[in-house]
C-alpha cells in the first residue's frame, strides 16, 4: 500500500541512534550470551541442569535469536528506514523481536517465582524434583509465545511510502497500522495488560524476597555473602524490567492509539520520539540478562572469576616483563650486566 509521507510522523534521529545502539548491543550480546551458553555446556551436563538453570539457558537462547536479527535492523535504519531486503526477512525479524521480548519477560518471571519459593519455602523447594517441571514450563512458554508470534510471519509486514524528498518511494518494515483498526488496538491492549500483570507479580515476589532476607539474622560471614548475592539478583531482575521493559509498555498503548488516529495529533510526534527511545531500551535486555546469571549460579561465578584472574595475571606479567626489560636496557651502555640466574 502506498501512503503519502506527509500523512505520518517520523523520528529522523533514529537513523543514527539505532545503527549505533544495535551495533553495540549486537557485539556485547553475542559475546556475553555466547559465553554463557559455552560455560553452561562445559560446567553442567544436560541431565544435571536444575529448574532455574533450564530457565536461564532458555532465556539465553531467546536473546541469541533476537541478536542474530540485529544486522537486518542495522541495515534497515542505516538506509533511512528503507527495507530493500526480501520481505520474508522483515517478517522473520519482527517475529523474533516479539519472541525475544515476551520469552524474556516469561523466563524472568519464572526465575523470580523460583527464587520466591526458595526463600519462602526452603525445605519444600529443596525436596522438590524440579527438573521435569522446568522442562515442562519452558515448553509451555515457547509453544505459547511462538504460536502468538507466528502471526508476524504471515501478515503483510511492509508498506510503501514516499521518501522525504518526494522524489521516489521507500519500503517500511512493520511501520503501518490501518487507521481506526479495532482488532489491532485490542491486541495491543491485551499485550500491555498482560505485561503489567506479570510485572506486578514479579514486583510482589521480589519485595517479599527482599523483606524476608532482610529479616533473617546473619550469624556467619557465609550467610551474609549468600544474602548479599540474593539481594543483588533481585535488584538486577527489577532493574532489567524497569530499564528495558516498563518504558516500552508505558508508551506502547498511546503510540498505538496515535498510529491508529485515535490520539490527538498534536502529541503524535512526541509519542513517536519516545517510542523509538524505548525500542532501544527494550533491546538492551540481551546484554543485561547475562548479569543475572552471575548472582544465580556458584559455578558460573567461580568460572568467570577464574578467567578474570587469569587475565589480570597475564596483564601483570606483561607489565613486569616490560618494566624489567626497560631496567636492564639502561645499564647496557655503561657496564656489562651479569645474566640473572634462576
Curated annotation (Swiss-Prot):
Belongs to the G-protein coupled receptor 1 family. Receptor for platelet activating factor, a chemotactic phospholipid mediator that possesses potent inflammatory, smooth-muscle contractile and hypotensive activity. Seems to mediate its action via a G protein that activates a phosphatidylinositol-calcium second messenger system. It is a multi-pass membrane protein. This is Platelet-activating factor receptor. PANTHER family: P2Y PURINOCEPTOR-RELATED G-PROTEIN COUPLED RECEPTOR (PTHR24233), PLATELET-ACTIVATING FACTOR RECEPTOR (PTHR24233:SF6). Keywords: Cell membrane, Chemotaxis, Disulfide bond, G-protein coupled receptor, Glycoprotein, Membrane, Receptor, Transducer, Transmembrane, Transmembrane helix. The chain crosses the membrane at residues 17-38, 55-74, 92-113, 134-155, 185-205, 234-254, 277-296.
